[in-house]
Swiss-Prot record:
Gene this protein is translated from: serS
Gene source species: Borrelia garinii subsp. bavariensis (strain ATCC BAA-2496 / DSM 23469 / PBi) (Borreliella bavariensis)
Function recorded in the entry: Catalyzes the attachment of serine to tRNA(Ser). Is also able to aminoacylate tRNA(Sec) with serine, to form the misacylated tRNA L-seryl-tRNA(Sec), which will be further converted into selenocysteinyl-tRNA(Sec).
Domain-related comment: Consists of two distinct domains, a catalytic core and a N-terminal extension that is involved in tRNA binding.
Binding site for ATP: 259-261, 275, 349-352
UniProt protein name: Serine--tRNA ligase
Amino acid sequence: MLDLKFIRDNLDLVKKSIKARGLVLDIDKLVYLDDKRKKIITQIGELNAKRNENSSKMRENLDNVFKSSLMETGKILKKQLIDLEEELKKISFDFDLENKRVPNILSPDVPIGNSEEDNFEIKKVGVVPKFDFKPKDHLELGRDLDLLDFDRAREVSGSKFYYLKNEAVFLEIALINFSLNKLREKGFDVFITPDVAREFIVDGIGFNPRGDESNIYKIESTDKYLVGTSEITLGGYYYNKIIDLTLPIKMAGFSHCFRKEAGAYGQLSKGLYRVHQFSKVEMFCFCKAEESQVIHDEFLSIQEQIFTELEIPYRVLNICSFDLGSPAYKKYDIEAWMPGRDGKGSYGEVTSTSNCTDYQSRRLKIRYKDQDGQNKFAHMVNGTAIATTRVIISILENFQDEKGGVRIPKSLVKYTGFGYIPFKN
């Protein structure tokens, strides 16, 4: 969430961010609720002072008539306090609800737009493969190479689940090890994170749906959720702590990710592209306010290194305002070339990285001391290192050959133990 003083001092800027994101939110209502809340708090303070004064007088040596009058006054004051405290409770609930809905402000260079066509393409890297045969999509390759089974998974678990089989199992593990080793070499602390988080941590990270439907699964009769990303559990690691940010704290977390993906059907969402469960390695950083932009660019650079070493053609996008989550000040996506996508080949999202400034740390009470010894809220940056399912799509589709097999990128061979997946009759 944003600092309330900042909101009051920059109402036009905050309203501009809300409008650019396509959100419906009455920021003036938030200011009104805050004013009303403060007024009630002042009234409660004044009534408590009167009540204390009344109680002090009752301890004096008084005649019965005056004492009875003071007792009656005390009852009235108590009733007024109870009513005001109940009103404060309701106003505070409404205020907190509205306050949490206010999104982060936007970086000045975020493209303003309401569709993916408004994302700004920064660059393209790599050569899109040209085949002298009709290429298959990853579903055909998964069947012909005995790597994927959606049919049995549908029977066992439902739609949008899958079995990885044979070489695909080692390919996923190789991608995880490849990315974790790279991040460890770059100074990240490496974690396997919980796949479950408490509701207040999920809320603190700011997973606010645009509508009424959350994209993550709640565990029935608990205050816990299955995580949609280890951003949630890494971000909550220092909940309510004052941390030492002499150097940025960089973390890499492996987790399974669970997402409802309600309504995500159609040609562009088929197969492994949009599923209910997948494995991912996430980058996360806690840093000082003045460092977050540099860290954000560093995360993008690491993502580019990963896909360059995987030999996968990709493009980098500066994401438009409408497609930013509430916590994000700025976001980059990398989209990899997928020859089987949309029947003719197109780019599909494989990573994102977001600078969330202090939006999440305010909710989670994560602070550091500046050079003057003052507590400041940490800035938080996140980014995908590897989301295995979509990278598997990219590898299968880009490196298939006329024999029906698939070459493994050289950077992965030492992790897979094989360099080629042959066609299976």
